[in-house]
């Protein structure tokens, strides 16, 4: 994300200053620039479907966090004012998921898998995240809005055949973190304030390894904040940089990586205990590629919306065909698939976040397609477009079905 640029401004006249002081933004006491905080979270891990319900024993979670926030005061590029002077933050979160227990009890549903005599757990998850908090309402001693988080997480007890065999939530030590929350904050005195978040947090490996169920939790969070600065006032009369609405084309090419749910199901439930691959924690990764052509319309400084065509190349489908056809599968197989998608992008300076909702026009990935995929797909990610690159950009994202990762990708793009 980009920081606000500091500019000098001429002093306000007394009438203008009086008029300005009547606005909610200037009356707010939440404009001291730098804040440190600490807090606690207590919540529950969500059970997402009937399959997970069959082996979840308990879901209690708790945690602590420490963070630093920088409140945006003013910026001549206009983004700060457009987002109502947001806050940027860096937070270290430590979540204790020892109270989350998983265990498969004897059932014919598990095929050849032999239940074990202990419960599995994700242990603790440490996350280092960047956050963006946008105030929707700010006046006097109160501030309310929404916040988004992205970062990297480390899980102390991922899935392991030897000692954590029923942990299907976290498949590796290193995970991707995403969070979203609604928040309210109240000023207590000159420097202290309280902030409460109703937070949803997700960590997973983005289909880069198995298992890939992901850990989803609702975590009410309370933070005690301390402002390091004496005062700060947004310079709301700073002239904004000019902005011109307009349409543009963009082409993106990306490569991604994924593992196969077919490998997971085969080794978990269709492999005898005497086989070396029985309930293994070693999985092969497969490469995928994608090409996108989009027509977008930038109708506001911070937003663009449009329609795009997506072409996917998934050579792992040939591997599935070679495995499944000899077993009697009559499903269709193709390494190529395509779709169209509605695309929306939110900008702040050189960075943007995107979300796509697409529908396949054709896709044939074998007998597991109806179980593991949907006719529609989602894609979320972040993009960096430095001005000196003359329209070139780099992006990192995840494509998913029903919010479950299909692959994680890295790509380049060009717009004109």
Residue ranges and their predicted role:
Residues 75-77, 140-144, 188-194, 230-233, ...:
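Repeated loop/turn-to-beta-strand initiation elements of outer-membrane beta-barrel proteins
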């Amino acid at each position: 994300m980009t920081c606000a640029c500091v500019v000098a401004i001429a002093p306000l006249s007394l009438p203008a200053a009086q008029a300005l002081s009547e606005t909610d933004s200037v009356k707010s006491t939440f404009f001291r620039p730098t804040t440190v905080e600490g807090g606690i979270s207590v919540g529950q891990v969500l059970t997402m479907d009937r399959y997970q319900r069959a082996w979840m024993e308990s879901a209690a979670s708790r945690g602590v966090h420490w963070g630093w926030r920088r409140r945006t005061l003013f910026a001549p590029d206009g983004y700060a004012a457009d987002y109502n002077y947001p806050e940027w933050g860096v937070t270290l979160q430590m979540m204790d998921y020892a109270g989350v227990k998983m265990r498969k009890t004897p059932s014919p549903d598990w095929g050849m898998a032999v239940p074990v005599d202990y419960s599995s757990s994700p242990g603790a998850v440490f996350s280092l995240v960047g956050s963006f908090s946008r105030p929707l309402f700010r006046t006097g001693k109160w501030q309310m809005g929404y916040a988004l988080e992205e970062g990297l997480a480390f899980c102390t007890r991922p899935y392991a055949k030897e000692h954590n065999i029923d942990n299907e939530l976290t498949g590796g030590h290193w995970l991707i973190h995403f969070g979203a929350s609604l928040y309210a904050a109240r000023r207590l005195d000159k420097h202290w304030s309280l902030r409460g978040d109703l937070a949803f947090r997700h960590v997973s490996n983005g289909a880069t390894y198995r298992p890939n169920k992901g850990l989803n939790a609702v975590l009410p969070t309370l933070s005690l904040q301390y402002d390091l600065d004496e005062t700060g006032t947004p310079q709301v009369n700073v002239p904004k940089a000019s902005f011109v609405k307009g349409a543009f084309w963009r082409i993106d090419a990306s490569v991604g990586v994924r593992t196969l749910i077919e490998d997971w199901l085969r080794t978990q439930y269709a492999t005898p205990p005497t086989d070396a691959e029985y309930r293994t924690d070693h999985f092969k990764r497969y490469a995928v590629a994608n090409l996108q052509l989009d027509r977008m319309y930038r109708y506001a400084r911070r937003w663009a919306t449009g329609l795009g065509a997506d072409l996917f190349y998934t050579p792992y489908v040939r591997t599935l065909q070679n495995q499944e056809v000899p077993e009697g599968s009559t499903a269709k197989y193709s390494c190529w698939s395509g779709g169209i998608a509605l695309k929306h992008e939110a900008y702040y300076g050189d960075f943007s976040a995107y979300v796509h909702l697409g529908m396949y026009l054709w896709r044939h990935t074998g007998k597991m397609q109806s179980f593991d995929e949907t006719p529609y797909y989602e894609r979320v990610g972040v993009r960096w477009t430095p001005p000196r690159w003359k329209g070139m950009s780099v992006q990192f994202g995840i494509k998913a079905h029903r919010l479950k990762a299909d692959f994680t990708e890295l790509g380049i793009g060009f717009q004109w």
